[in-house]
């Protein structure tokens, strides 16, 4: 590898999950590509087959985004702990995410997992929506 590519790789290794996610979105926009294009084709095929057999199944959403809308100031630490556990973010990144609400906590997760996370955040004092 060249020194330039090694430097880029080292920079990428130091990114948090939130920063890496934002980087992927920026790359997708800048180059007009999708990082999940091949996985989307694999995922779409079973869904399309199920949709042909049952029209209702095609309309049911299977992946959800968990969005922290707001939180009680007194419960900030509790919400922060739940967000850290769910995302694997470091303290600083999780704090930044919580303080910048409304903000997406997790994207594209299963309905059951999304509902569980929503319940945990709400019990800690946050207000959450699923999209």
From Swiss-Prot:
Biological processes annotated in GO: translation
NCBIfam families referenced in this protein's UniProt entry, alphabetically: L12
Sorted UniProt keywords: Ribonucleoprotein, Ribosomal protein
Pfam families, per the entry: Ribosomal_L12 (PF00542), Ribosomal_L12_N (PF16320)
Species, as recorded: Prochlorococcus marinus subsp. pastoris (strain CCMP1986 / NIES-2087 / MED4)
SUPFAM superfamilies to which the protein is assigned, alphabetical: ClpS-like, Ribosomal protein L7/12, oligomerisation (N-terminal) domain
One GO CC term, this protein: cytosolic large ribosomal subunit
Functional summary from the UniProt entry: Forms part of the ribosomal stalk which helps the ribosome interact with GTP-bound translation factors. Is thus essential for accurate translation.
Family affiliation: Belongs to the bacterial ribosomal protein bL12 family.
Name of the protein: Large ribosomal subunit protein bL12
One MF annotation (Gene Ontology) recorded for this entry: structural constituent of ribosome
Summary of subunit composition and partner proteins: Homodimer. Part of the ribosomal stalk of the 50S ribosomal subunit. Forms a multimeric L10(L12)X complex, where L10 forms an elongated spine to which 2 to 4 L12 dimers bind in a sequential fashion. Binds GTP-bound translation factors.
Key word Protein biosynthesis present: no
């Amino acid at each position: 590898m060249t020194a330039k590519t090694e430097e880029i790789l080292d920079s990428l290794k130091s990114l948090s999950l939130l920063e890496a996610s934002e980087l992927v979105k920026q790359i997708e926009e800048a180059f007009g590509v999708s990082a999940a294009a091949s996985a989307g084709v694999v995922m779409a095929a079973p869904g399309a087959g199920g949709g042909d057999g049952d029209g209702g199944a095609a309309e049911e959403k299977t992946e959800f985004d968990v969005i922290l809308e707001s939180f009680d100031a007194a419960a900030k630490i509790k919400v922060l702990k739940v967000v850290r556990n769910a995302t694997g973010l470091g303290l600083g990144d999780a704090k930044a995410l919580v303080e910048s609400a409304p903000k997406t906590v997790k994207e594209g997760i299963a309905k059951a997992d999304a509902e569980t996370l929503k319940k945990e955040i709400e019990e800690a004092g946050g207000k959450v929506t699923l999209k």
